[in-house]
Amino acid sequence: MSLDEKYILYYFDVNARGCIIRALLSYVKANWENKVIEYNDFVQNYKHKKEFCEYGQLPILEYKGKYYSQSMAIILFLGKKYNLMGDNEDEEYEINNLLCSFEDIFPLIHDQNQEKKSAKYEKVRRYFKIYEEKYLKHVKENKGKKYYFANDKFTLADIYFGALIYSMLNSLKEIEMEKEFPELKKLLDFYKSDNALKEFYEKYYINSIF
């Protein structure tokens, strides 16, 4: 890959949505730079530059002189580019189905109001009580020897789940995964230990900060 094909990911020093893109770029071993921006720097020097920051928010992915915005659009762009969306339309549907369900949890946790913390934890618990069985069903129906969601290989669904969901739940100390969701914990631990995401966790994962 030539220098003009290098990716630059602009994001804050947190996991959140940016961690999925970091994990994805790490997994495909892309030539990329993890450009961490302080919030005040973003507001003063980046937010109002429409040619750079179309919607006034991060993450932004720079590639070949173009600035890509909106995290899910970036994730799908990279997923398609690196053949992580399945081998046919049915597999792509299954992966997109899972991605949409993963997105459902994001509003439950992305609340900065400290007074709502206990309510937030209960919402997250309810979500996983409903969805844990569904997620594990996908893995079992895949019939592979590993914990993959589709096509018995690593796909965008695995990267999303292994990066964002792990970091999200790891930041919620009030939820004891091993006691409350033991099977889901095994699945998450598999993603953390698997070589596919090893570089992400060693270099780019931000411990206990969602």
Predicted regions and their residues:
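GST-like fold's C-terminal all-alpha helical module
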Residues: 78, 87-90, 94, 98-196
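Short, contiguous strand/loop micro-motifs
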Residues: 7-9, 174-175, 199
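GST-like domain detector, emphasizing the conserved glutathione-binding G-site
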Residues: 1-119, 126
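C-terminal helix/juxtamembrane-tail motif
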Residues: 2, 185, 190-210
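Conserved beta-strand positions that form and line the central face of beta-propeller blades
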Residues: 60, 67, 147, 196-199
